A protein has these predicted regions:
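Core dinuclear metal-dependent hydrolase active-site scaffold
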Residues: 34-100, 166-172
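Active-site metal-binding motif and surrounding structural segment of the metallo-beta-lactamase
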Residues: 1-26, 31-33, 97-106
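Short glycine-/acidic-enriched loop or helix-start segments at secondary-structure transitions
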Residues: 1-4, 25-27, 60, 91-93, ...
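Binuclear metal-ion centers of metallo-dependent hydrolases, dominated by the metallo-beta-lactamase
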Residues: 14, 22, 26-40, 121, ...
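Metallo-beta-lactamase
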Residues: 9, 13-16, 49, 73-130, 135-144, ...
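Short, glycine/charged-enriched secondary-structure capping and boundary segments
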Residues: 5-7, 30-31, 63-64, 95-98, ...
């Protein structure tokens, strides 16, 4: 959330999030589109579904950030799930049933503040996706992970885990 303002102002990107977060950034002059749990909206790039997530939600100044959420983004070629910095939740099981098969699941793996490696493996099973891009890890001590151990655990579960350095990309 700390980079949203700078990125949106630099790129002109629209902020898509819950009502409270969009309202916060609109006060800073940034265009947004508010959503809420269970909602979907079709944009020029594809359809966005707002999904459940479980974690705290506040801004650095203490402003309440509303109920947390994740997203499923559908384009003409791909469908991906962005869990956000959530815990494992049983609601994830609904995603493939309600929205459809995923090409990639972007899941937190750092533990302590989010789910860890073992829970991310379970989450990838819940959402029915064997390709996972790990996020929310290694930025500070509490969420450091052993990359080799994480990749090995995913491989033993017959899943692929991608742990990209900052600035890298992944082609679907």
């Amino acid at each position: 959330i700390l980079d949203v303002e700078a990125i949106a102002k630099r790129t002109g990107a629209k902020v898509i999030s819950n009502y409270e977060i969009v309202g916060y950034f609109e006060k800073l002059g940034i265009e947004g589109h508010p959503m809420n749990h269970g909602g979907k909206w079709t944009f020029d790039f594809g359809t966005v579904h707002y999904t459940n997530a479980i974690h705290s939600s506040s801004f650095p100044d203490g402003t309440y950030g509303g109920q947390p959420g994740g997203f499923v983004i559908e384009t003409s070629h791909h469908r991906l799930y962005i869990a956000g910095d959530t815990a494992l939740t049983y609601d994830m099981k609904l995603i493939p049933d309600v929205i459809g098969e995923l090409d990639l699941a972007i899941l937190p793996v750092g533990d302590n503040f989010t789910m860890g490696i073992d829970e991310a493996i379970k989450a990838s099973t819940f959402v029915g996706c064997n390709k996972v891009l790990g996020v929310h890890f290694d930025t500070f001590g509490y969420i450091k992970i052993d990359h080799n151990e994480a990749i090995t655990k995913f491989a033993k579960a017959k899943k692929e885990l991608y742990l990209l350095p900052i600035g890298d990309n992944l082609k679907l």
